[in-house]
């Protein structure tokens, strides 16, 4: 029987249980966990064998990683655009791509893409845990029909897919994990969206993290409909409570703070992420514009990388350079006291109070700094270092 305290919410056990003895339940925070019905369970062990919290089949640690920038699709994604370059060629060759995207109700779900139009929504960053309900059945049907599959997800999700299907469909299944600090819940995200709608007096129809509308590492944009008219709103991360709290690591799912996949050895054939800090090693690469980090972890990963190399500018670096500014290449984020406080506020005072508690306490000061020219920031930081 699975250890529900370690559950990461992938729902793979729900899919594999032959006696339908496992339900997927969510708590007040919106965190999903498997729940075993003892009356139906015969202790066959199927769930234990595929659980990514208990079984992690990791690849050899690569010595080098690549910094990559797409020649034509840098703005399609949140970083350098290499995911689109790989995935679009995978589709061109008759394959199917699976990744996360918001639906029309701003629910983050894993979706299936067989066209370039379906692929585009999968490219942007989404800082919450995607729903995998129904995805495994679709994956199984595609694999059984002989299709090649490229699945991208958080390491725990990638591991679930690998544990379920890699033995039987090894040659057809290509997996990418991404450098994941942790994921928040749909419930907390929804609460922040509802408060934003109340403040603006309209209905938000789409949302984009890491919007490239400003020269900043983290900014957002969304479309809101008011009185039949649509308007695009953009801002910095600290102006949207969910984004601000995510970057403070205070709203992750509980299992994220002890994630077994936050290390150099990775579960995917390739690992994707942002190459934060690369400007310190190559001044021609500005990570605020987006620079992809890609690590090849297997022979199949090399095939994926080869699909995109002719359409990207690529630079090779030692692994430790990427790990220096990406903690998820070293260890999970520590559990913050603030998270416990936020859960208590939600339990006692409700969603509106939670969003207020998640908000940046000094937006004006942050706005002043964000809008300051880079040269002034550098002078200030240099002077501060000598005080």
Task: Identify the residue ranges that each predicted region occupies.
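Short, charged low-complexity linear segments at domain edges
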Residues: 12-34, 126, 222-241
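Short, flexible loop segments at boundaries between secondary-structure elements
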Residues: 173-195
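Short, surface-exposed basic-aromatic patches at helix termini and helix-loop junctions that form
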Residues: 162-173, 193-198
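Immediate flanking context of iron-sulfur cluster ligation sites
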Residues: 1-5, 35-42, 146-149, 238-254
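Flanking helices and flexible, charged tails adjoining ferredoxin-like Fe-S electron-transfer domains
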Residues: 39-145, 320-334, 338, 344-357
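Long, compositionally biased charged/polar accessory segments in the mid-to-C-terminal portions
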Residues: 93-96, 197, 202-387
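Iron-sulfur cluster-binding cysteine motifs and their immediate structural context
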Residues: 1-6, 12-35, 45-63, 265, ...
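Gly/Ser/Thr-rich loops at beta-strand to alpha-helix junctions
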Residues: 78-81, 104, 151-161, 182-184
């Amino acid at each position: 029987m699975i250890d529900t305290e370690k559950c990461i919410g992938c729902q793979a056990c729900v899919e594999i249980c032959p006696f339908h003895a496992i339900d997927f339940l969510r708590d007040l925070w919106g965190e999903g966990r498997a729940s075993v019905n003892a009356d139906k369970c015969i202790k066959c062990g199927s769930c234990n064998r595929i659980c990514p919290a208990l079984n992690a089949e990791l690849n050899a640690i690569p010595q080098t990683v690549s910094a990559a920038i797409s020649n034509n699709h840098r703005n399609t994604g949140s970083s350098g655009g290499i995911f689109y370059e790989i995935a679009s060629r995978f589709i061109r060759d008759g394959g199917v791509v699976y990744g996360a995207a918001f639906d029309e109700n701003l629910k983050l779900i894993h979706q299936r893409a067989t066209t370039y139009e379906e692929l585009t929504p999968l490219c942007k960053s989404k800082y919450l845990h995607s729903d995998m309900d129904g995805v495994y059945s679709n994956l199984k049907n595609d694999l059984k029909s002989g299709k090649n599959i490229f699945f991208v997800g958080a390491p725990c999700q990638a591991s679930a897919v690998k544990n379920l299907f890699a033995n039987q469909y090894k040659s057809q299944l290509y997996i990418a994990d991404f450098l994941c600090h942790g994921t928040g819940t749909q419930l907390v995200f929804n609460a922040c969206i509802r408060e934003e709608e109340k403040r603006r007096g309209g209905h938000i129809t789409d949302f984009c993290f890491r919007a490239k509308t400003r020269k900043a590492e983290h900014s957002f944009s969304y479309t809101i409909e008011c009185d039949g008219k649509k308007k695009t709103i953009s801002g910095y991360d600290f102006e949207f409570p969910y984004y601000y709290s995510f970057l403070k690591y205070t709203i992750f799912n509980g299992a994220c703070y002890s994630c077994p996949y936050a290390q150099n050895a990775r579960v995917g054939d390739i690992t994707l992420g942002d190459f934060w800090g690369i400007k310190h090693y190559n001044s021609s690469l500005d990570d605020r514009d987006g620079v992809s980090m890609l690590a090849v972890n297997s022979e199949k990963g090399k095939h994926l990388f080869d699909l995109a190399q002719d359409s990207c500018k690529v630079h090779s670096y030692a692994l430790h350079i990427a790990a220096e500014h990406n903690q998820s290449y070293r260890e999970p984020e520590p559990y913050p006291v603030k998270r416990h406080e936020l859960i208590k506020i939600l339990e006692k005072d409700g969603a509106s109070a939670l969003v207020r508690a998640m908000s940046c306490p000094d937006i004006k000061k942050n706005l002043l700094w964000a809008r300051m020219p880079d040269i002034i920031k550098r002078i200030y930081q240099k002077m501060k270092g000598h005080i």
